[in-house]
């Protein structure tokens, strides 16, 4: 198992100095991935339900501060040497598909082949409407098409795609990514996401803290991973070739956080407890663990990074 840091696009990483410091230190400490989230605007009023909080509210919905995901990945590419750059996750319908493919390929070239695309279909209908995305109700089908178009553009000498949401032919798309094709990890925890991961993903990359589809135990994660692999088999694919990551936000190394029943929340507690959680997911099939401990204070974020890399990772 290797490890990554989800930086987000706000807080301590929401400015040049903070993003540079955290990205470079994660690189120096030998972490494998830097993750960046994807929002462009928030509307002042919204009926959409954020899937990763019990009350359905996004933590920044009131003020909406967020840097652009792909711009942050480009910046991080310029100030790091080895760490991979992960869209964690990209809301696939947010941007026009050919432009998105070009931006990701360009970052891959400028980083010498360090891009991994985490891909999701999104949850904030009002944001998609502002951006002119395909209708919210067809975001899954549109995302599937966009992904097929990305791969055509990245790998084919004369790329073409004809579909309900993406149409192009007779185009020259250069440069191609440095990698044969940019790996695409499908995000999401529900049945549709598991099906998408198994059938068209290069990997699966769920979050553990989804109240509707919780993966906050290694056993729950293992059961859902088995479902992803079944979907791969049904699609005629080798299920063991799928890459498997997991995103554990809310990391606390120190006093454990307790849920309403008094049970310790996963990935909180002593270094040994957090490492034990990580080993559980590793044994269940996860190859990559990305943790999140966003802070508004740079010194605090750097301290948390040091503790995780030096006190937890060696125990896994």
Each language-model region and where it sits:
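Active-site-adjacent structural elements that line small-molecule/cofactor binding pockets in enzymes
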Residues: 1-316
